[in-house]
Regions:
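A generic structural micro-feature
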Residues: 60, 87, 119, 172, ...
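Outer membrane beta-barrel
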Residues: 53-205, 233-238, 242-250, 321-327, ...
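Loop-centered beta-sheet repeat module
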Residues: 214-264
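Outer-membrane beta-barrel pore domains
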Residues: 29-40, 81-82, 125-130, 150, ...
Length: 416
């Protein structure tokens, strides 16, 4: 907690100094001094570019640019007829800091405060050195390039208030670790090919020893010590290939694998090496002159679980989501020149224990699915007002009648 408080204070001081410095020049022409850098939409972009493709604010000759976003909402939820009433949620307040250190050398960090200050995380803090467009070195705290949502998760981008179930529990976004790696892109006419490959610290034994009483990669990432040491003493590998066509869309295939358990300590062998692996496929496309957008992702998890564990802890998991969003109105509204009204729907599913019981042969349940209709108003591209209704069904391990949940949500998200 002391570390989190220290980070918060230093970040706050930096923002205050930035604002004070800009205010001290208020008597001059601030339109020349203060410059807003919008997200770059002029070039073909992949999900791997999302970390830098954000709006920033610079001031004069300061060597740093800042930005961020805020998410807040209210919701009313009811499960099997039981409700705790309305709640207001300040979900995320995120700050970005970027700097060009020298030619072809740059730095970016992302600091996120969740639920007020309940969680404070450095989600990204890395230096990039470009030797060639196909060969860039990145090191520090990096986002593991598994799936697309883990890389492209900023709230203002999405018309849905909740993050996808599979992006929280199957792939535990936002997943970051300390490490190094390479990335690059290659352009050919309308095509762009990108790759990323990193070696980082990985998960720990909490994958199979947690309060959820199931196999959970989300529980395995909660250990803050992963930023200073590897629990297994071995690196975790994450790699991704992505290809994009200007007219068709983007397809990405990614893989992550590593030993998660403490198999050796002080030279003594405690257990065999047990791995956790994830294979993910993501895609996105735009149709009808960008008025219809389809985004999706599926992921399969493989975990080596000790034979002494019961089947409550699954060796395989699967999940995914698909968002279909259409623009039904785009015009000047209340003084906003290019305001948009979108309608959409999200379909999502997660199975935390694929397989059947050894004794009975019956199917193991422990799954959840949901459908989420959405109405979103975008006065400008960086701000969204969202209204969602969420209907979900969740079954326990034995497949008993599912718990039925309905959630009404209204909120906003904006870059600043």
């Amino acid at each position: 907690m002391k570390t989190f408080t220290y980070i918060f204070k230093r970040s706050l001081i930096l923002v205050v100094l930035f604002c004070s410095f800009t205010n001290s020049n208020a008597q001059t022409d601030t339109t020349k001094f203060i410059q807003r850098i919008p997200a770059d939409t002029s070039k073909q972009k992949l999900n791997m570019d999302a970390v830098y493709n954000r709006p920033f604010l610079t001031a004069g000759k300061l060597p740093i640019a800042i930005g961020g976003y805020l998410e807040a909402n209210t919701q009313y939820a009811q499960t099997d007829g039981i409700s705790d009433g309305f709640s207001f949620q300040a979900r995320r307040f995120t700050l970005f800091f970027s700097s060009t250190i020298a030619k072809k050398i740059k730095f970016l960090s992302e600091l996120e405060f969740e639920d007020g200050t309940k969680e404070i995380n450095i989600e990204f803090a890395a230096m990039d050195i470009e030797f060639h467009p196909l060969l860039n070195l990145r090191g520090g705290i990096v986002m593991n390039p598994i799936g697309a949502f883990n890389q492209n998760h900023d709230g203002p981008i999405w018309d849905f208030i909740d993050r996808p179930i599979s992006a929280l529990t199957i792939i535990p976004s936002t997943l970051s670790n300390a490490g190094f790696g390479l990335h690059g892109k290659y352009f050919v006419k309308r095509w762009i090919l990108g790759y990323e490959a990193y070696l980082t610290n990985g998960f720990d034994d909490n994958i199979i020893s947690n309060e959820d009483n199931r196999t959970s990669l989300a529980a395995g990432k909660r250990n803050p010590a992963r930023f200073e040491e590897s629990n297994s003493g071995l690196p975790m590998f994450t790699g991704k290939l992505a290809i994009r066509n200007r007219k068709i869309g983007e397809l990405g295939i990614s893989y992550m694998t590593g030993v998660y358990n403490k198999w050796k300590q002080d030279g003594l062998i405690l257990d065999s090496k047990r791995s956790a692996s994830v294979l993910a496929v993501d895609f996105n496309t735009s149709l009808i002159k960008n008025r219809l957008n389809i985004t999706g992702e599926v992921a399969k998890v493989f975990v080596d679980v000790p034979e002494t564990y019961t089947q409550q802890f699954g060796t395989q998991q699967f999940g995914g989501y698909m968002d279909i969003v259409g623009t039904v109105l785009k015009r000047e509204i209340l003084g906003w020149d290019n305001a948009k009204l979108n309608v959409g729907v999200r379909l999502e599913y997660a199975d935390y224990n694929q397989g059947s019981f050894k004794v009975t042969g019956g199917n193991i349940a422990d799954d959840i699915w949901a459908i989420v209709p959405s109405i979103a108003f975008r006065p400008v591209g960086t701000t969204v007002l969202r209204f969602n209704y969420r209907y979900e069904q969740q079954r326990d391990l034995l497949g008993n009648p599912p718990a039925l949940t309905g959630v009404i949500q209204f909120g906003f998200s904006t870059y600043f």
